[in-house]
Each structure stands twice: as structure tokens, then as C-alpha cells.
């Protein structure tokens, strides 16, 4: 009998493609405990040329951030039993230099305080985007980040 060939090729071929993509596309960590928001942000990011990885909890995000040097991060400030500020402290302990886009339902004062905390931790918050997410605005910020990443990647 004939084996049907997957249109993606073998699992080994697919892994090779994904490994190559990891070196040519910026990696984005999407931290949001809301499944729908996380999925939407991942899709917008993929369309903007990122390789997104979603984390539904503080623990999952902390593990991913420790295992992978992400080029960019989106962070919800409310992560169930943890605050986004706890994630900022964790990212700082890891020495993360990834630009951060805060995506939150919190008010302006909370966003402003988050930026101050991030600055004290030597983290780089690019923007605070309110929920519900304006997809055009999100894509605009991601495209700016990708252009910045491309400039750095070409210079390296």
C-alpha cells in the first residue's frame, strides 16, 4: 500500500522548517489568561510576521520565558492569582531585554504605574493597549516592533 504524504512533508521536515523560522522571525510571548484574547493576539502577531507562543498563566509564562529568549512580549496585567507586575519582576530577574506591550483592561493610572515599575526594573514597555483590543492598533505596534527587530537582526 501507498502511504499518503502530508502536504507539510514529514514531521522531521516540519521541525526543520520551524527551526529555520525561529531564526528568521521574531519570537513573541503572549501572556494572557483569557483564551480568546490570547488566541486573537497570537493570530494578529503571526500575520504581522511573528512566531507567537501563548501562555495562559503566570507559571506557564515564567517557564516559557526561562526556556526561550523572546524578542517581544505582550502582557495582560491580570493573570488570575498573579499580577502582571509579578511577571515584570520575573522577566527582570531573567535579564529580559524584550520590548513589552501591555494589553489590559486596567485603567490609565494602573498602566502608568506599570510603566514606572518596568522602568525601575530596566524593562522596556513600548505601549499600553486597552481591552477590548483594537486589532488595527495592535497590528500597528507589532509591525513597528518587527521593523525594529529586523533592523537589529540585520545589524547583527
Kindly give the residue locations of the regions a language model identified.
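Alpha4 helix (beta4-alpha4-beta5 surface) of REC/receiver domains from two-component response regulators
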Residues: 86, 106-128
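Acidic catalytic/metal-coordinating carboxylates
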Residues: 57, 83-86
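The feature encodes the CheY-like receiver
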Residues: 80
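Two-component/phosphorelay signaling modules centered on CheY-like receiver
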Residues: 20, 35-53
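Active-site residues of response regulator receiver
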Residues: 76
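Non-catalytic signal-transmission and effector/linker regions of two-component phosphorelay proteins
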Residues: 1-29, 42, 136-156
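Short hydrophobic/Thr-rich beta-strand motif most characteristic of the beta2 strand and flanking loop
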Residues: 49-57, 64, 129
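Conserved acidic carboxylate
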Residues: 32
Amino acid at each position: 500500500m501507498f502511504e499518503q504524504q502530508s502536504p507539510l512533508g514529514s514531521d522531521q521536515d516540519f521541525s526543520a522548517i520551524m527551526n529555520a523560522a525561529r531564526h528568521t522571525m521574531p519570537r513573541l510571548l503572549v501572556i494572557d489568561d483569557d483564551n480568546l484574547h490570547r488566541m486573537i493576539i497570537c493570530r494578529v502577531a503571526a500575520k504581522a510576521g511573528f512566531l507567537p507562543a501563548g501562555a495562559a498563566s503566570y507559571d506557564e509564562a515564567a517557564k516559557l520565558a526561562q526556556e526561550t529568549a523572546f524578542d517581544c512580549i505582550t502582557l495582560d496585567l491580570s493573570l488570575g492569582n498573579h499580577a502582571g507586575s509579578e511577571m515584570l519582576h520575573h522577566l527582570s530577574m531573567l535579564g529580559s531585554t524584550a520590548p513589552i506591550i501591555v494589553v489590559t483592561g486596567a485603567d490609565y493610572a494602573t498602566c502608568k504605574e506599570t510603566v514606572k515599575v518596568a522602568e525601575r526594573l530596566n524593562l522596556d514597555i513600548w505601549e499600553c493597549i486597552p481591552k477590548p483590543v483594537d486589532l488595527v492598533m495592535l497590528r500597528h505596534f507589532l509591525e513597528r516592533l518587527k521593523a525594529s527587530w529586523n533592523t537589529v537582526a540585520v545589524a547583527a
